[in-house]
Amino acid sequence: MNIRPLHDRVIVKRSEVESKSAGGIVLTGSAAEQSSRGEVLAVGNGRILENGNLMPLDVKVGDIVIFNEGYGVKKEKIDGEEVLILSESDLMAVVG
């Protein structure tokens, strides 16, 4: 994937979600929830602080993260895959 996020931005590929209910019914459309977890594919250099110093990000490529998909999250298709571009502040946790 040929993309490099800027500053405190992170590129995340959303994890697949089980598309069957507990009873074995296949869920489609709005009944199938989207995952709020994904794999970090790329990270920016860091956030520039008020004093001009660069604060590196806490996440790295390959981390599995839980994110808040709210205002400011951008969906893009890169090389045919849908990815999310979000700020590190939209990440809530690293899994594992």
UniProtKB/Swiss-Prot annotation:
Q: What is its main location?
A: cytoplasm
GO-annotated molecular function? ATP binding; metal ion binding; protein folding chaperone; protein-folding chaperone binding; unfolded protein binding
What UniProt keywords are attached to this protein's entry?
Chaperone, Cytoplasm
Can you supply a Gene Ontology BP term from the record? Answer: chaperone cofactor-dependent protein refolding
Q: Name one GO cellular component term.
A: cytoplasm
Kindly give the PROSITE patterns that the UniProt entry links to this protein. CHAPERONINS_CPN10
Gene3D superfamilies associated with the record: GroES chaperonin
Where is this protein found? Cytoplasm
Keyword Phosphoprotein belongs to the record: no
What Pfam family is a match for this entry? Cpn10
Please give the InterPro entries that the UniProt record associates with this protein: Chaperonin_GroES, Chaperonin_GroES_sf, Chaprnonin_Cpn10_CS, GroES-like_sf
Spell out the family assignment given in the record's similarity comment. Belongs to the GroES chaperonin family.
Describe its partners and assembly state. Answer: Heptamer of 7 subunits arranged in a ring. Interacts with the chaperonin GroEL.
Question: Which NCBIfam families does the record associate with it?
Answer: PRK00364.1-1, PRK00364.1-2, PRK00364.2-2
Q: What does this protein do?
A: Together with the chaperonin GroEL, plays an essential role in assisting protein folding. The GroEL-GroES system forms a nano-cage that allows encapsulation of the non-native substrate proteins and provides a physical environment optimized to promote and accelerate protein folding. GroES binds to the apical surface of the GroEL ring, thereby capping the opening of the GroEL channel.
Q: What is this protein called?
A: Co-chaperonin GroES
Source species of the chain: Shewanella pealeana (strain ATCC 700345 / ANG-SQ1)
